[in-house]
Amino acid sequence: MDCVPSLFMPDSTYEDGLLFSDSFLLSPFISYQNNDVFHSITNKIGGSNKKRSLCDITYGANEANKNDDDRESKKMKHRDIERQRRQEVSSLFKRLRTLLPFQYIQGKRSTSDHIVQAVNYIKDLQIKIKELNEKRNRVKKVISATTTTHSAIEECTSSLSSSAASTLSSSCSCVGDKHITVVVTPCLVGVEIIISCCLGRNKSCLSSVLQMLAQEQRFSVVSCLSARRQQRFMHTIVSQVEDGKQINILELKDKIMTM
């Protein structure tokens, strides 16, 4: 016999070597004449599976390459952002070092030390600002008090000057006394002249006496002191006399009295 009988004889046809009906189970006993067909079917199915697996591998490789490219671009962006951030931070630290005084950064090289010294500098500035504010407030109080006092003094002075002017206009302060009294006494360097005059004569009294002494070739004024006592002025003049010259004290006194 050329072939082994099968249990079932499937009613199916082969076209182009492909099995169109698989509704029947093939018998384990297949004719030797059908071996070529079976191998052809197996080869074609395996080829299609290989093609499908190659497509899957190619697609997976493309996806992997795409993911790698995305990951690399993200890394580059991150590096650029980090580089820019570090440059900005470095410029800020340089600016901070320029703002700090030398005594705060002397011997300090690290960035952390600079930050600590910057905090200390800010605290010191706050303390100084507080002290200056307190000093300003004290000065303001003193100025306001001084202004008030000055205004009160000006009012009092104006009232006194007006009353004094009215008093002088009506009567002199040296009623019953002389307008000017002169005492001339000898001293170690020459003579000492003490003049007491009232307010009305004070303006011209001292200048006239000094002018007279300057015109006299025998006298050289050493010192001149003035003081006020109540309504009169006291002038003390010390004048040096040239060597070998005699001074008539009474004559000098009369000259001063008659000025």
Curated annotation (Swiss-Prot):
InterPro entries in UniProt: bHLH_dom (IPR011598), HLH_DNA-bd_sf (IPR036638), MASH1/Ascl1a-like (IPR015660)
bHLH domain mapped to chain residues: 73-125
UniProt GO BP: regulation of transcription by RNA polymerase II
GO CC terms of this entry: nucleus
Keywords: DNA-binding, Nucleus, Transcription, Transcription regulation
Example of a GO MF term: DNA binding
CDD domains per record: bHLH_AtORG2_like
SUPFAM superfamilies: HLH, helix-loop-helix DNA-binding domain
Location of the protein in the cell: Nucleus
Source domain of life: Eukaryota
Signal sequence coordinates: none
The protein's assembly and partners: Homodimer.
Protein name: Transcription factor bHLH125
Lineage: Eukaryota, Viridiplantae, Streptophyta, Embryophyta, Tracheophyta
Annotated gene: BHLH125
